[in-house]
């Protein structure tokens, strides 16, 4: 047997409107998706609670439901209304009581004095690897917005606004998904609740005009991707004449040789196997030229060495990072007869005979004797 709307809200059939509203608040809060994330059962119950409330809070729909049942409502456009809100007014009042003041109500609408433009904005600036590391001068072209003086930033002819017909001055509209109604900012007035009856001819209803400008900027040493540099008083111009700031967001390119990690530089450097065995002072490239690395005898493949203060200067201080050199030992891929003979003699001089070194042979003998004992 199908559960009734009264049972869903846990009320009796003779409940008055205030009782229905209180019951809805309780059940909606209990099963709201924000409090039951990922719970499909709670989501389904929340939909039923909204469905029940939309019927029982409406005298006409409730009377039809009480007399003919749920099926009688389907043909009459259940879940919708001529105003397009589908019970939105009551839903907004209810949700405001436990999700913040003014949810879905006119108290959330913006003031017509609000700016149509933000005071600050961001522009991206691409730099080469070296420009970011060592700093540079860059000329930046940008576009900024200036609040329209003709309409005082309203976008309306002579600055005159009328109540938005879409949201009736609320600044929000109800959007239904099934039996659930959500509040969203009115797309026609952007939440102000008012709009122009006739657009300003100067700004075409935007409330602002755009202008182009350029500025030369000194990029400091050590900037990196994601960092922002503030340029004072180069932002948008607001109604009261104050001007915001422009933020320049750095996008630094990578390098084919060096890898940067904050203020440290990494490089993989090839070393011939004889250099690794014998040890040697070698020259390695750095971001400033080259430096000497004293390679110890018996250096291992992948071993890392630190060249202090050969990295990037910190953008906020005078500290300089390090360069980390990771060696990659290289072996010859082809040998002539003379080289082959020399290597064979070298191999024999280390006691390698019949393809096995004396130490390896001794180890095998120890293992064999262990099994015999």
Curated annotation (Swiss-Prot):
**Compartment list:** Cytoplasm
Q: Where are the zinc fingers (CR-type)?
A: 135-212
The CXXCXGXG motif repeat units are at 148-155, 164-171, 186-193, 200-207
Question: In which residues is Zn(2+) 1 bound?
Answer: 148, 151, 200, 203
List cofactor names only.
Zn(2+)
Which keywords appear in this protein's UniProt record, sorted alphabetically? Chaperone, Cytoplasm, DNA replication, Metal-binding, Repeat, Stress response, Zinc, Zinc-finger
Q: Does the keyword Chaperone apply?
A: yes
Against InterPro entries, the record matches this protein to: DnaJ (IPR012724), DnaJ_C (IPR002939), DnaJ_domain (IPR001623), DnaJ_domain_CS (IPR018253), HSP40/DnaJ_pept-bd (IPR008971), HSP_DnaJ_Cys-rich_dom (IPR001305), HSP_DnaJ_Cys-rich_dom_sf (IPR036410), J_dom_sf (IPR036869)
Annotated PROSITE patterns: DNAJ_1 (PS00636), DNAJ_2 (PS50076), ZF_CR (PS51188)
Residues given in the record as Zn(2+) 2 binding sites: 164, 167, 186, 189
Q: Name one GO biological process term.
A: chaperone cofactor-dependent protein refolding
An example GO CC term for this entry is: cytoplasm
Q: What is its main location?
A: cytoplasm
**Pfam families with a match to the protein in the record:** DnaJ (PF00226), DnaJ_C (PF01556), DnaJ_CXXCXGXG (PF00684)
Give the domain note.
The J domain is necessary and sufficient to stimulate DnaK ATPase activity. Zinc center 1 plays an important role in the autonomous, DnaK-independent chaperone activity of DnaJ. Zinc center 2 is essential for interaction with DnaK and for DnaJ activity.
Q: Please give the function described in this protein's UniProt entry.
A: Participates actively in the response to hyperosmotic and heat shock by preventing the aggregation of stress-denatured proteins and by disaggregating proteins, also in an autonomous, DnaK-independent fashion. Unfolded proteins bind initially to DnaJ; upon interaction with the DnaJ-bound protein, DnaK hydrolyzes its bound ATP, resulting in the formation of a stable complex. GrpE releases ADP from DnaK; ATP binding to DnaK triggers the release of the substrate protein, thus completing the reaction cycle.
Quaternary structure and interacting proteins, as annotated:
Homodimer.
Entry similarity comment: Belongs to the DnaJ family.
Would you tell me the protein name for this molecule?
Chaperone protein DnaJ
